[in-house]
Amino acid sequence: VITYAACGGALLNDYAPFAFGFAYIAMAYSVGNISDCHLNPAVSLACLIRKKMSLIEFLYYVGAQLFGGLFGSFLLGLCLRGYWGVLYSSIVTNKLRHPYKKDKNGWNRQDGWYYVDGLLVEFLLTFIFVFAFLGAKDPKQEGKHQGIVIGLSLILVTNMECYFANASVNPAKALGSALIEWFELDDPNNNRAIKQIYIFMAAPLAGGACAGLVYGLLAGD
């Protein structure tokens, strides 16, 4: 749903953060009572660290998330067949895209620091999102508004992330779309998503893990 509906909505209009946030809210109230609606390996890793799920459950969840990201990317591309190049140069795939190439001194921002920027942004925004998820799902919280809180948090981080790297904070979404781009685009020089996939896998997982550890320390459990 995140890859198919949210990315599809973001592709066809200028409101990408809302597409992702509303997609999560819809799923939270649809399947949240069944699976807690992680939809993101970084979230599942944080829950594993907090001992909210077993290792076997974690592997099942992550496997389903990765499959969902790949299948959703495939369906979206199938619905827009003939436009793979346009589709996967857009919000669907995660690539670093610094808003400027050089500063006033002529320093090229696409050197090594360009990738450090991406790693840092992915780490910090995933940390914020997963921390908000854990807080909203804490049993101490009362009410049934967790899905709205988490969806709004996703809108917040996506709003900033679109500026840097096409809005990921989700390894499953990033990997699925990158693999489809890799298989479908003829020009290997355009396959930047798969070449940069380590950023969108490692940084969100690290951010999710740190969020789980920090939340556990602050919550005293």
Where are these regions (language model features)?
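Membrane-interface helix-loop junctions and terminal tails of multi-pass membrane proteins
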Residues: 1-221
